[in-house]
A protein has these predicted regions:
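Catalytic Walker B motif of ABC-type/P-loop ATPase nucleotide-binding domains
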Residues: 40-44
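A short, surface-exposed alpha-helical micro-motif characterized by mixed small hydrophobic
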Residues: 81-83
Length: 127
């Protein structure tokens, strides 16, 4: 199922060393989903993905959450976090400077605006 979704079915017999970066990323993501986990912890899951695969990945993450699961992921693309996440944590220079429900953290701003505000001021908005 997942190999078909990510268009890897025809390459499954090939050596992984022959895969492109994007294909390796897809394979890693498939391996994360294949056992139908209730919790996924992903580091930069969209890096190396083409737009179609990124959309598939977002839909799979939403589907997992809709079924009662949870996804924790890191990203440097704040727009992705803002669109996908119910809860968010902002880390600046290794320090947790904001966390909570997305709407509580950002208010009427964008996540990017909040990030730069706390990064410039080097403050913790949870205090």
């Amino acid at each position: 199922k997942y190999a078909d979704l990510f268009n890897l079915t025809n390459s499954l017999g090939d050596l992984i060393s022959s895969y492109s970066h994007g294909m390796k990323q897809k394979l890693a993501l498939i391996s994360a989903f294949i056992r139908h986990p209730k919790l996924l912890i992903l580091d930069e899951p969209f890096v190396g993905l083409d737009p179609e695969s990124a959309l598939i990945m977002k839909n799979l993450m939403k589907e997992l959450c809709d079924e009662g699961g949870s996804v924790f992921f890191s990203t440097h693309v704040l727009e992705v976090a803002e669109k996908l996440c119910d809860n968010v944590a902002i880390i600046n220079k290794g320090q947790l400077v904001a966390n909570g429900k997305m709407e509580d953290v950002i208010g009427d701003q964008s996540l990017e605006d909040v990030f730069f505000e706390v990064a410039r001021k080097n403050v913790n908005i949870n205090e």
